[in-house]
Regions:
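Helix-termination/interfacial motifs at the ends of transmembrane alpha-helices
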Residues: 13-32, 37, 152-225
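Alpha-helical transmembrane segments of multi-pass membrane proteins
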Residues: 58-69, 215-227
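Short, flexible segments with low predicted structural confidence
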Residues: 49-52, 62-63, 123, 206, ...
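Hydrophobic membrane-targeting segments
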Residues: 2-79
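Predominantly long cytosolic amphipathic alpha-helical stalk/bundle segments
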Residues: 71-169, 180-192, 219-253
Length: 253
């Protein structure tokens, strides 16, 4: 009797060990590779999550580099503009900035608008009579700030989408794994751990992968939303000062 009990315990331990091995990531991948026809949905879910993760990390890196660059450029460019002795030298300095530097582009748009309005002044029924210099420069600055603010949003929609949908994509894999477990129970006529370990493991792994993809995307979206808001506020402050400068001809700093 004791011997039978020991054999049963040993068999139970072996079954439990086999079940645990079937619930691992390596076993899931090996099963998906060896039986691709049975795991079409699993492959679609897994590849979708991998693509979503790759795209979200790509835009996270891009936004980190862009935020770091803008943080260093903001004070340097604006200070250089106001510290330059005259407007012509300040404009020339802005023209020497990199093409993707937003603060210099805003300043150049304001300068071009002021120069264009000045040339149009005095013409019969021309621009100078339709809009004042202040209104014309203000319109140009609004357009410039809107353009540069929009450029900051690159990848933000994707990060928000990944953060919101990746868990549900993982849940699709979870549901499919549970469905597979039920099918296996029906086929074998028993609900032993050996019968359902593989599908249940797949379900849990897909849930974990979905969360692994979504959580960094959510953190990145929230972080860059805050940093972009701070940068846009700097755009607005610089634009207001530029408006006063080009509309009146007097420095505000």
């Amino acid at each position: 009797m004791l011997q039978e009990t020991l054999f049963a315990a040993a068999a139970g331990g072996t079954n439990a060990a086999n079940a645990l091995s079937q619930m691992g990531f390596e076993h899931m991948i090996s099963e998906m590779i060896s039986k691709p026809g049975e795991f079409i949905v699993s492959w679609v879910v897994l590849l979708t999550l991998v693509i979503m993760s790759a795209m979200s990390w790509y835009w996270t890196v891009i936004n980190v580099l862009r935020s770091s660059r803008l943080k260093g450029q903001a004070d340097r460019v604006t200070s250089a503009f106001w510290e330059t002795p005259n407007a012509q030298d300040a404009i020339r300095l802005m023209e020497e900035q990199p093409k993707n530097e937003p603060f210099s582009k805003i300043a150049l748009d304001a300068a071009q608008a002021a120069a264009h309005h000045q040339r149009a002044e005095g013409s019969a029924a021309g621009l100078g009579e339709t809009l004042s210099r202040s209104e014309f420069v203000d319109r140009a600055l609004r357009q410039a700030v809107t353009r540069e603010s929009t450029n900051l949003q690159g990848g933000m929609t994707l990060l928000a989408t990944v953060g919101a949908t990746a868990p549900f994509v993982g849940l699709l894999g979870t549901g499919w794994g549970i469905y597979g477990a039920l099918i296996r129970i029906g086929a074998t006529g028993q609900a032993s751990i050996d019968a359902v370990a593989g599908p249940v493991g797949e379900a849990l792994i897909m849930t974990a992968i979905g969360l692994f993809v979504a959580i960094p995307a959510v953190f990145a979206y929230n972080f860059f939303s805050k940093t972009n808001s701070a940068t846009i506020a700097k755009f607005d402050t610089f634009a207001h000062d530029l408006h006063d400068f080009f509309a009146t001809g007097s420095r505000v700093r």
